[in-house]
């Protein structure tokens, strides 16, 4: 039969690239699970009353090439002016060796958060290096492995200050008046829900205020002034006030460490260590504190520990502080942070080393001195005598200066009264400085760079002597060894080799959706049209971004059944927080601000109660029945008990138990009956897209994990994006922004992230995914995700019972394998199975969530039947090994499971185990063998002997 031109053009080609099983494999799996077709399987599993009659109208699919061309045309609408706006964002030079070998390398960007340290030693080492950079530059004792951005780090510092404060009756937080405005915006938002009063004043007036538990200072103020706060900090400490300091990471290379001046907490953005501005993100924040406060710190902390053989190994330390364990009592709701961006900054420091960083910082400062000297020679006045890279220049004809700047395609900071701000960076050249002279002085200024350089080289007073750093930084060998590109390339490859990512095997983590991050989706994030825009540039320079974001928001509205989408939250946890704030402010607008009870099912993800606590709500847990579903009787009882104080329920759908609950609409109706709102967590949206939607189900607000459902990679623990979809009545209450107003959704609400559109530069990934899949492909992706999960469940059911199933014994897009009976019978635990899977070449499923003693498996639609069978075969082989233990062939204390994982050095060591070396290391054969570099971690040792900085290089050898 002759094909039509449309068939030959094959606009849906990407659908077959994204979905792992081909048509024949899908049919084999359908036969195995007893279903005739994908539609028939979906009809059996998803409750009839919530199935969409037609898929959301997001358009037909496009080929990779057509979608890239379309997006390139949109991106070209952005105008790439040279931005000197500053305010915490500068242009950078990302070393090509890091761009090619890390940012564009799936071995780095497709990995998951390093909960399984044995398969994560490479990125853990890079994160430990990031912590060492933070410690050296801040002068403090403990550092985290990144927070979401500088503004949220400030909010976390405020919350931490209250936790550690000895002034228990104090309830006021003081913010110096020259912090960045976006920082103040986010701090005010967080303070409102915590019930703190924020005082904003000149830093020197802080002592005039009473009942202050914490203070936020900025070492280099938002308009450029360097502050020596040594004496002030000393006085504040004498009054037991916790002092936080925001710092510029590049300025810290030259300036004295705030920790040496007495600061308790120091934080800032690591963006200018090689991470493009990207219209606001993603960027990693650094965060450090005194040792005595370590158990009150937010976010991930990487620590040095030992493995079972006594070898040095790295792990995430002190996890009992975090939301997945402590829930509403956690220090923070942080789940996804900014690992990929922290690692870029880490490797930037490794590549340049202390000498290179000092050269870069000194060059920036020298050019700033030259600019300052020339302007002063011509009679212009600088508002500050002490500066690093930012000048606040008073101008009589401000409108004329800004007009000349625009004509020269230059952005200056324009929001300062009777002055302009100019921030230089590592990309600034002599030619740029001469151009700035022309903009500020006119073309006939007559200034010469070399002459000015001689003048300032021997007489620079722009940094106070007391503020000059007098100690060495980055003395560890890792920062002094890899400065040639060859050495750097090999070092990065050595780290990558230690880790297990999607470029080697499926990562079947339940509730994580580790699907394909296609190359075509990733390509646009490095386009300069997207990468080089300042988040506070004039909106007419970002028309491409605005068009792309508007299209993506429109598609998400259609896919979710909501009326509006806010793109600001830069992680799923931030999305939860933003959605709950919208609910809170909605109730307040109706004079029902007393509604503060949040109902949360016992099965919920730990971020849910942590976010509810952050939003100022009381958490009341709703029981689940024996089938894992929300207990409707208990829900109704708790809702009645809450009465007029009921704010909302947070529910995940399909449930975290891997089931489409039949009563989800009734759950929504009960909560609405008592005046509450329904927050539907979007963590499992990959089982909804095209089949049903939160808005159609009856929810009022959801966050969407774009780094799950919509293909943004996990990056080893970030970046993420968590935009929220809302019904119309909540739209006026989504986050706003004090610097940039969000067109189409102007609100007076405070911000939750530093940038108005969060991590805007990764939104093209989700745009590309939806554009290439179209309505047809998106629905099919959800259906195949469901098929893959049911195929695994059906094949493993006899060996590992599936804990919860829905109608007809089916699961949704993930399934929970119950290991508890086996553990009781044999002594082998879910942990042993997880570690043994490493020997078979797999990352473990999610352990002990949402039920202790279980493994939760989510294969996604991207894995082929071949890979699913390989995983199933590994699990069945492990079950046979457990049977060997049960039969007494291998003792419980010495078998391949309890000793897993096995490493290369064991092959040549003395062997005293009752099983062979081959059984130990080659259980799945020798082809494509993944070798972990450490044995099972000793978690107890790591937390009892907490060490969170770089160890001697010999320990890695």
Swiss-Prot record:
Alphabetized Gene3D superfamilies for the sequence: Aspartate Aminotransferase, domain 1, Type I PLP-dependent aspartate aminotransferase-like (Major domain)
A GO CC annotation given for this chain: glycine cleavage complex
Domain of life assignment: Bacteria
EC number: 1.4.4.2
A biological process term (GO) from this entry: glycine decarboxylation via glycine cleavage system
Cofactor: pyridoxal 5'-phosphate
An MF annotation (GO) of this entry: glycine dehydrogenase (decarboxylating) activity
Enzyme class: oxidoreductase
InterPro entries: GcvP (IPR003437), GDC-P_C (IPR049316), GDC-P_N (IPR049315), GDC_P (IPR020581), PyrdxlP-dep_Trfase (IPR015424), PyrdxlP-dep_Trfase_major (IPR015421), PyrdxlP-dep_Trfase_small (IPR015422)
Residues carrying N6-(pyridoxal phosphate)lysine: 708
Reaction it catalyzes: N(6)-[(R)-lipoyl]-L-lysyl-[glycine-cleavage complex H protein] + glycine + H(+) = N(6)-[(R)-S(8)-aminomethyldihydrolipoyl]-L-lysyl-[glycine-cleavage complex H protein] + CO2
Keywords attached to this entry: Oxidoreductase, Pyridoxal phosphate
Role: The glycine cleavage system catalyzes the degradation of glycine. The P protein binds the alpha-amino group of glycine through its pyridoxal phosphate cofactor; CO(2) is released and the remaining methylamine moiety is then transferred to the lipoamide cofactor of the H protein.
Assembly description: The glycine cleavage system is composed of four proteins: P, T, L and H.
Family named by the database record: Belongs to the GcvP family.
Protein name: Glycine dehydrogenase (decarboxylating)
UniProt organism field: Escherichia coli O7:K1 (strain IAI39 / ExPEC)
């Amino acid at each position: 039969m002759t094909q039509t031109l449309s068939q030959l053009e094959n606009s849906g080609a990407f659908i077959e690239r994204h979905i792992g099983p081909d048509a024949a494999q899908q049919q084999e799996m359908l036969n195995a699970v007893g279903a005739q077709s994908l539609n028939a399987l979906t009809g059996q599993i998803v409750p009839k009353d919530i199935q969409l009659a037609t898929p959301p109208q997001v358009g037909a699919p496009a080929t990779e090439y057509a979608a890239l061309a379309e997006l390139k045309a949109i991106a070209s609408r952005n105008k790439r002016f040279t931005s000197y706006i500053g305010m915490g964002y500068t242009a950078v030079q990302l070393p090509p060796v890091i761009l090619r070998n890390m940012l564009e390398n799936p071995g780095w960007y497709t990995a998951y958060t390093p909960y399984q340290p044995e398969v994560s030693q490479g990125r853990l080492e890079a994160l430990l290096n990031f912590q060492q950079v933070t410690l050296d530059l801040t002068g403090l004792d403990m550092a985290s492995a990144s927070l979401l951005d500088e503004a949220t780090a400030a909010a976390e510092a405020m919350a931490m200050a209250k936790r550690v404060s000895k002034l228990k009756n104090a309830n006021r937080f003081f913010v110096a008046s020259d912090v960045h405005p976006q920082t103040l915006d986010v701090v005010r938002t967080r303070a409102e829900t915590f019930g703190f009063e924020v005082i904003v004043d000149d830093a020197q007036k802080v002592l005039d205020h009473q009942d202050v538990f914490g203070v936020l200072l900025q070492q280099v103020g938002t308009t450029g002034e360097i502050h020596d706060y040594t004496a002030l900090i000393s006085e504040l400490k004498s009054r037991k006030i916790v002092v936080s300091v925001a710092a510029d990471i590049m300025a810290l290379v030259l300036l004295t460490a705030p920790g040496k001046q007495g600061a308790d907490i120091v934080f800032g953005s690591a963006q200018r260590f090689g991470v493009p501005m990207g219209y606001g993100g993603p960027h990693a924040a650094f965060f450090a504190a005194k040792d005595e406060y370590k158990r009150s710190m937010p976010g991930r902390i990487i620590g040095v520990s030992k493995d079972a053989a006594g070898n040095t190994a790295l792990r995430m330390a002190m996890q009992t502080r975090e939301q997945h364990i402590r829930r509403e009592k956690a220090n923070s709701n942080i789940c996804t942070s900014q690992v990929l961006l922290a690692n870029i900054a880490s490797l930037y420091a490794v590549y340049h080393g202390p000498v290179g960083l000092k050269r870069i910082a000194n060059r920036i400062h020298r050019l700033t001195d030259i600019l300052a000297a020339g302007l002063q020679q011509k009679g212009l006045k600088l508002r500050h005598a002490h500066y690093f890279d930012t000048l606040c220049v008073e101008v009589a004809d401000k409108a004329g200066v800004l007009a000349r700047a625009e004509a020269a395609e230059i952005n200056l900071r324009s929001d300062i009264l009777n002055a302009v701000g100019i921030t230089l960076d590592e990309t600034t050249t002599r030619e740029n400085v001469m151009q700035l002279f022309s903009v500020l002085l006119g073309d006939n200024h007559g200034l010469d760079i070399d002459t000015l350089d001689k003048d300032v080289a021997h007489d620079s007073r722009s940094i106070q002597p007391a503020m000059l750093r007098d100690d060495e930084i980055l003395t560890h060998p890792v920062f002094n060894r890899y400065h040639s590109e060859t050495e750097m390339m090999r070092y990065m490859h050595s780290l990558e080799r230690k880790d297990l990512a999607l470029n080697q095997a499926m990562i079947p983590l339940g509730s994580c959706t580790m699907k394909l991050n296609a190359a075509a989706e990733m390509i646009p994030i490095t386009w300069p049209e997207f990468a080089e825009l300042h988040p506070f540039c004039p909106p007419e320079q970002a028309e491409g971004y605005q068009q792309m974001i508007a299209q993506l928001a429109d598609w998400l509205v259609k896919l979710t059944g909501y009326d509006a989408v806010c793109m600001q939250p830069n992680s799923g946890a931030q999305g939860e927080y933003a959605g709950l704030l919208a609910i809170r402010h909605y109730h307040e607008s109706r004079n029902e601000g007393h509604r503060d009870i949040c109902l949360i099912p016992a099965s919920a993800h730990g971020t849910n109660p942590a976010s509810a606590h952050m939003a100022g709500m009381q958490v009341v847990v709703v029981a689940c029945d024996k089938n894992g579903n929300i207990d409707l009787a208990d829900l109704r009882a708790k809702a009645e008990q809450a009465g007029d104080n009921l704010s909302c329920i947070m529910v995940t759908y399909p449930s975290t138990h891997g089931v489409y609950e039949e009563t989800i609409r009734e759950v929504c109706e009960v909560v609405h009956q008592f005046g509450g709102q329904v927050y539907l967590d979007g963590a499992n949206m990959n089982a909804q897209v095209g089949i049903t939607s939160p808005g159609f189900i009856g929810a009022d607000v959801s966050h969407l994990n774009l780094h799950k459902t919509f293909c943004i990679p996990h990056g080893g623990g970030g970046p993420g994006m968590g935009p929220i979809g809302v019904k119309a009545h909540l739209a006026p209450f989504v986050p706003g922004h004090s610097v940039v107003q969000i067109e189409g959704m102007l609100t007076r609400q405070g911000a939750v992230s530093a940038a108005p559109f969060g991590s805007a530069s990764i939104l093209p990934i989700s745009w590309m995914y939806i554009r290439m899949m179209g309505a047809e492909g998106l629905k099919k992706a959800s259906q195949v995700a469901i098929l893959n999960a049911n195929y695994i469940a059906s094949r493993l059911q006899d060996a590992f019972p599936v804990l919860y199933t829905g109608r007809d014994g089916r699961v949704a897009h993930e399934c929970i394998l119950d290991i508890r009976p086996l553990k009781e019978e044999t002594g082998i635990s879910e942990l042993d199975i997880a570690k043994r899977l490493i020997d078979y070449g797999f990352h473990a499923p999610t352990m002990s969530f949402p039920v202790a003693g279980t493994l939760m498996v989510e294969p996604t639609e991207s894995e082929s039947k071949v890979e699913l069978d390989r995983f199933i075969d590994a699990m069945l082989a492990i079950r046979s090994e457990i049977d060997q233990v049960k039969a007494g062939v291998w003792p419980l204390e010495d078998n391949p499971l309890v000793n897993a994982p096995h490493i290369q050095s064991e092959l040549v060591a003395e062997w005293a185990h009752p099983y062979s070396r081959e059984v130990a290391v080659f259980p799945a054969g020798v082809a494509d063998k993944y070798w972990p570099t450490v044995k099972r971690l000793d978690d107890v040792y790591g937390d009892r002997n907490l060490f969170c900085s770089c160890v001697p290089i010999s320990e890695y050898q």
